[in-house]
Amino acid sequence: NYNFLYYLAYCNLTCAVAREVVEHYGDRTAEHPVGTGPFRLAFWKRSSKMTFEPNPNYREDLFDGTPPADDAAGQFILSRLKGKRLPLVDKVEVYVIEEPQPRWLAFLNNELDFLERVPNEFANVATPNNELAPNLRKRGVRMERTAGMELTYSYFGMKDPVVGGYEPEKVALRRAIVLGQDVGAEVRIARKNQAITAHSPIGPGALGYDPDFRSTATEYDPAKSKALLDMYGYVDCNGDGWRDLPRKSAADECRPFTIEYASAPSAQQKPLDENWKKNMDAIGVNMTFRKAKWPDLLKESKAGKLQMWGLGWS
């Protein structure tokens, strides 16, 4: 496997470190990253700030690149930096600003030099018609628009008694929920057209990505969703407007059926939740939301306590 060494050094996947590091830090190993990159972690305050300083042991590495001839911005950067030794700066400070409005205002107020991405809520203001706004251009702001190597998805807790399992009715339930979710509306409304529909687990920029591949995994068909739910007994048996769990016979009592989706209490998450709620209402599925901070949800997820949650990788 020619990619094996790459996998060992790819921290999003494995990030292998010396045994002594793990033995010394134990469960806190992730708080003490060890690597051979251009920077090392100098300060970290959870959910607040990280400071990186140059790694004195970093190898000799000179800036280089091969931007296309028609990439004016790339050619300009190359002309200024080609041949200079990396890293180019003495310190990098990363601030964790969870809410989009304070993050955007901090950038406008020159408190930040770089914003990784424009918050979706301000995309139409900052980049009308996907072009940098004239007022920002006058201030010397530059924008680089790329398809990020990132993929977001929603998962089902496969050990959950309601949505998990491999019985035919459970498989049908998960398929029905997927068929009832309008991903196109999520892209247009919740993500302000700053995303594309994923048709595979491989995102743009990753080896194996095929922009022409189309999958039925993101098919939106509420009629088919309702038919599947009806077929496997997820029907409204008490007339309250919501579907109930399947019954073995008509004489059995109705059992309420609710899907709980975990999500963070953020402005960015709100339109995503609203899209889910609207879509599930349309097929008669009662969806509620489990609100908690991301680190807390991660702990619950690892413990197998979440029915559904949205995650991603980049």
What are these regions (language model features)?
Residues 1-22, 27, 35-51:
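Surface-exposed binding/hinge segments that line
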Residues 43, 48-64, 76-83, 167-278, ...:
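Append "and occasionally in soluble cytosolic enzymes with long acidic Gly/Pro-rich linkers
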Residues 37-40, 50, 89-95, 255-264, ...:
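Short, well-ordered beta-strand elements
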Residues 2-6, 59-61, 103, 113-115, ...:
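Short beta-strands and strand-coil junctions in structured, solvent-facing domains, enriched
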Residues 103-104, 173-174, 297-301:
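Short, hydrophobic alpha-helical packing/hinge segments within bilobed ligand-binding/sensory domains
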Residues 2-14, 36, 155-157, 164-167, ...:
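A structural "hinge/loop" feature
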